[in-house]
Amino acid sequence: MAVKTTKTAAEDHLPTREEAEAAFAFALDARQDRVRAALDKLAADPPQVLILEGGSVEERFSVALWHAARLNCPEAQPPCLHCPSCLQIGASLFQDLYVLDGREGSIKIETVRELRTILGEAPRGDGKRVVILAEAQSLGVEAANALLKSLEEPRPGVCFLLPAPQRERLLPTLVSRGWVVTLAWPEADTPSTPELRQWEDALADFIGSGQGWFDRTSGKGAVDAALARRIVLSVQKAQAAVLARRHGGSL
């Protein structure tokens, strides 16, 4: 898994506004108003490490891209979401944006080492170099330790964004080095599909009895990455509903 950046494409091809803005759609949802306000305050002096927890996989990545645009948009009220920098970031083509993508698998130590060779360079533009470790809980132990070594050295102009379901799923030493911003939790009232409902029922039975789950999931191809994310999201929705009732209202 290589570090994803496309400098040539960023220079030679500018995506349409509609293509790029689609990447910001989840971040622009009214549910994330509080999150955008918090990130706006941090932008003047951004932390080197920012953990984005809560929300869904898509929401976390969208907010990370929005924050990258906020840090690099040259307009008076950033992010404008229509200048070349914002459009390139929305399409993941920006020259100072690097994505280590753990959404479909683990982030390997080789990828982090490749990144470290880049970090010694100054940003190519006037803003910040932004490194997004998408689903940072996918960092292997060796990769996480290699990242920690990079964080030991002050790197002006570089911001690491670590989207993850919960901060507890990251190494404590990583969490201790950064700020944490919590996205709005997934809405609890979205109905499940019949297929997902079967998995929800099976998981509930397993929690109650300790039986059946491993038989259901151990078959080859029984659970792919997309299904696993939907199951986790369903659990998060249920958790949000319980917490909302406990606190007498919505979160």
Model-derived features with residue positions:
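AAA+/P-loop NTPase substrate/partner-engagement loops
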Residues: L81-L97, D101-K108
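Conserved alpha-helical scaffold flanking the Walker A/P-loop in AAA+ ATPase domains
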Residues: A37-L42, I109-V130, A136-S138, E142-S150
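Charged, glycine-rich active-site and insertion segments that engage polyanionic ligands
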Residues: M1-R70, S85-Q88, P156-L251
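ATP/adenylate-binding site constellation spanning eukaryotic-like Ser/Thr protein kinases
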Residues: F94, V112, A144, R167, ...
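Cys/His-enriched microdomains
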Residues: S62, P78-L81
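Post-Walker A helix-loop "phosphate-sensing" segment adjacent to the P-loop in P-loop NTPases
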Residues: A68-P79
